[in-house]
């Protein structure tokens, strides 16, 4: 199990990403726009740098919804490989069965 503080930190990052997503996309659009003036583009870069560091989506880490484990995460289920296996063996994941050939 991951520490509670790590889970809380990830939750905080998720909130910040959601809060600043629109602002971040607007600023990035200005930065990429070649028709915008150099001054406007530079101002957009500076404003983007002023946003909180944790508001960047690349700072988020995929974690298991049950244990908080950061490695062996399966996006399709939102769980770590260990918990996916446990739930699959109990038959709690619809349509998932153990392979045999």
Swiss-Prot record:
It comes from Aeromonas hydrophila subsp. hydrophila (strain ATCC 7966 / DSM 30187 / BCRC 13018 / CCUG 14551 / JCM 1027 / KCTC 2358 / NCIMB 9240 / NCTC 8049). This is Small ribosomal subunit protein uS14. One of its GO terms (biological process) is translation. One of its GO terms (molecular function) is structural constituent of ribosome. One of its GO terms (cellular component) is small ribosomal subunit. PANTHER family: 30S RIBOSOMAL PROTEIN S14, SMALL RIBOSOMAL SUBUNIT PROTEIN US14M. PROSITE patterns: RIBOSOMAL_S14. The keyword Nucleus does not apply. It comes from the Bacteria. Pfam families: Ribosomal_S14. Part of the 30S ribosomal subunit. Contacts proteins S3 and S10. InterPro entries: Ribosomal_uS14, Ribosomal_uS14_bac/plastid, Ribosomal_uS14_CS. Binds 16S rRNA, required for the assembly of 30S particles and may also be responsible for determining the conformation of the 16S rRNA at the A site. Belongs to the universal ribosomal protein uS14 family.
């Amino acid at each position: 199990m991951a520490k509670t503080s790590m889970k809380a930190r990830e939750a905080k990052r998720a909130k910040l990403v959601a809060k600043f997503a629109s602002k971040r996309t607007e600023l990035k659009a200005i930065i990429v726009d070649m028709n915008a003036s150099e001054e406007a583009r530079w101002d957009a870069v500076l404003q983007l740098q002023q946003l909180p560091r944790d508001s960047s989506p690349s700072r988020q880490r995929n974690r298991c919804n049950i244990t908080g484990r950061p490695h062996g995460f399966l996006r399709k289920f939102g769980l770590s490989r260990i918990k996916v296996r446990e739930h699959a063996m109990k038959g709690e994941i619809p349509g998932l069965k153990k392979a045999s050939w």
